[in-house]
A protein has these predicted regions:
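Short catalytic-loop micro-motif centered on adjacent basic/acidic residues
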Residues: 168, 194-196, 221-222, 242-244, ...
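An acidic- and aromatic-residue-enriched active-site/binding cleft used to recognize and process polar
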Residues: 171-172, 198-201, 226-229, 245-249, ...
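PLP-dependent aminotransferase-like
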Residues: 165, 177-229
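N-terminal Rossmann-like NAD(P)+-binding subdomain of aldehyde/semialdehyde dehydrogenases
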Residues: 1-150, 184-185, 197-202, 211-216, ...
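ALDH superfamily catalytic-core signature
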Residues: 48, 192, 199, 209-220, ...
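Hydrophobic/aromatic ligand-binding patch that stacks against planar heteroaromatic rings
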Residues: 184-185, 233-234, 425
């Protein structure tokens, strides 16, 4: 970039930050009611711009509005954002009226002595009906209990943030991510935000400036577009007090420790980061799906195979929550049957446009040494069975961020012994700490509750799911979302800190989501769902005006899936 362009970028940035500095002072003076009114004003804008939002994302990803995949852009875009805004508004109302967030149930102590805080269902949003059969809890750190649940809460005094400006470097894959990250910084952390959109989804600029006009008008938010030069200017600007980054750990390390290997090594050795301001992040993950050996019915096997396949193909697999490593037992009699079901499902799902930059190169890297026939510009869904961490280390230690999933086997027919070995394996051999799933037979869940809870406790992940895809945890918005709290600047793994967390919990380690082996009605994220787009739009209408009168149409479409 030439000097003139650099100067122009700096002038624009300085002008933008000047507006935010005034907004930061105004935010400090805003009452709870005033902030809630801003939240509600943004929520009121979403229905007017939702169609535009979905159309531009589908167009960019080459998805027809009539395809099942179009539902992903509704659910992971305006519908999810509207749910989050409703939950945020409810949080501020609860704090204003009751002094604390109102949990959906009472905390409990589980069999291994961990305090578990319920965060689902939210009855005001009809969760018991919409997320039927699912439960979610936040597990506190072992040394904490229910007597110290909440972080510093929003208040009329508004001591949070203290006039600070946050730089948010947005995700390029899922449209709700930059929006919810930005909202978290403003309404949880009390910091105004300079949001830089990722070049991959800069097409959201017009939609976002319209939806979030109430925040922009109050100078609590400014949105910029641009490439690396704009990102670097934001990171290094002295008036930016904190950063939130969504991307790969390579991006994080380049920001914190430097752009080349020697510089990074020297700075790490001397504990001398390039950036001396707080940094939170959500990074990548080689997401594991552990299958506990046991006897499953054909229906259960098929349902779990669909869950796995859905987790691979969602958003063309450009997700940090996409399953990248299935862990099975070499002694499990149903292993071949299960994997064949996953393979068949993947073969029957049309390949998707690989819209994310570098996908072809990452696909070839993941399939190194294998002959893969590619007959179209789209990349084929690929399941690589019986992989080994020594001969194919890249599949275990690098998030491919492309439509490739691997499978590896561990010995053992005893379910408890296998699960213990699998937990140790994914903790030690796989990159990342974001999320993991365990599929377990009903008999195991019923008879080995203690073993299952110990396994969940030992997994070093920010979210652990039983029989369900971790993408659901992201979409719920009530759970804290982020990597395991053991991460730090030198080893960020899947990220530092968290977002969402609409009950303002603290001292937590992970979210635990549980569901049945067979979900009814069919999950809307299954590719085989026949009416997914109708469900998505009906859900958005429900979150627009939560009312029992909007449920019949939602259920009509859901039951036809």
């Amino acid at each position: 970039m030439n000097a003139a362009a650099t100067s122009e970028t700096q002038v624009e940035l300085d002008s933008t930050i000047l507006k935010l500095k005034q907004g930061a002072q105004d935010l400090k003076a805003m009452s709870l009611k005033q902030r809630r009114q801003l939240i509600d004003a943004c929520a009121a804008n979403i229905p007017d711009f939702a169609q535009q939002w979905v159309e531009v994302t589908c167009n960019a990803k080459q998805v027809s509005l009539t395809q099942p995949a179009a539902a992903e852009e509704i659910l992971a875009g305006p519908a999810t954002l509207l749910r989050y805004l409703r939950l945020l508004s409810r949080l501020f109302q609860d704090v204003e009226q009751a002094g604390t967030p109102q949990l959906p149930g009472s905390p409990r102590c589980n069999q291994i002595g961990r305090t578990c805080v319920p965060i689902l269902p939210v009855r005001s949003l009809f969760d018991p009906l919409i997320f039927r059969g699912l439960s979610a809890e936040v597990w506190l750190n072992p040394e904490h209990d229910e007597h110290d649940l909440f972080a510093e809460l929003p208040s009329d005094q508004n001591t949070l943030g203290n006039g600070k400006i946050a730089g948010v470097l947005g995700a390029g894959n899922v449209s709700a991510i930059p929006a919810t990250d930005m909202l978290y910084k403003i309404f949880h952390d009390g910091e105004v935000v300079l949001l830089k959109l990722n070049p991959v989804n800069e097409y959201l600029y017009s939609t976002f400036t319209s939806v979030f006009a109430p925040l922009i008008e109050k100078q609590l938010l400014q949105i910029l577009r641009g490439g690396n030069e704009v990102g670097k200017a934001i990171v290094n600007h002295p008036e930016i007090n904190s950063l939130h980054v969504t991307g790969s750990h390579h991006t994080h390390d380049a920001i914190v420790w430097g752009g080349n290997a020697d510089e990074r090594a020297n700075r790490m050795a001397n504990n001398d980061p390039l950036v001396n301001k707080p940094i939170t992040s959500e990074l990548g993950n080689v997401t594991p799906w552990i299958v506990v050996p046991g006897k499953y019915t054909n229906r259960q096997l098929q349902s779990q195979a669909e869950h796995v396949a859905a987790s691979i193909v969602n958003n063309a697999s450009f997700n940090c929550v996409a399953t990248k490593m299935i862990v099975t037992s070499s002694d499990w009699p149903q292993r071949s049957d299960f994997l064949a079901r996953v393979e068949t499902l993947l073969k029957n799902i049309p390949p998707r446009h690989a819209y994310y930059p570098g996908a072809r190169e990452r696909f070839e890297r993941a399939n190194a040494g294998r002959e893969i026939a590619i007959s179209s510009p789209a990349l084929p869904w690929t399941l690589i069975q019986n992989t080994d961490p020594k001969s194919t280390a890249h599949l275990f230690q690098e998030e491919s961020f492309v439509c490739v999933c691997a499978e590896t086997m561990l010995p053992g027919s005893d379910p408890v012994e296998f699960l213990n070995a699998a937990v140790e394996f994914v903790n030690d051999k796989l990159f990342g700490t974001l999320c993991a799933t365990i599929t377990a037979p009903n008999s195991f869940e019923n008879q080995e509750t203690l073993a299952l809870e110990k396994a969940i406790s030992k997994l070093r992940y920010g979210s652990v799911c039983v029989n369900q895809w971790a993408g659901v945890v992201y979409g719920l918005m009530t759970p804290p979302w982020g990597g395991h709290p053991s991460s730090d600047l030198k080893s960020p793994q899947s990220g530092i800190g968290h977002v969402h967390n609409t009950f303002c919990l603290k001292n937590f380690e992970k979210t635990v989501l549980r569901g049945p082996l067979c979900s009814q009605p069919k999950p809307v994220w299954f590719h085989s769902h026949k009416t997914a787009t109708q469900v998505g739009w009906s859900l958005l209408k429900l979150y627009d005006k939560p009312s029992i009168t909007r449920l019949p149409r939602l259920f009509f479409h859901a039951l036809r899936g």
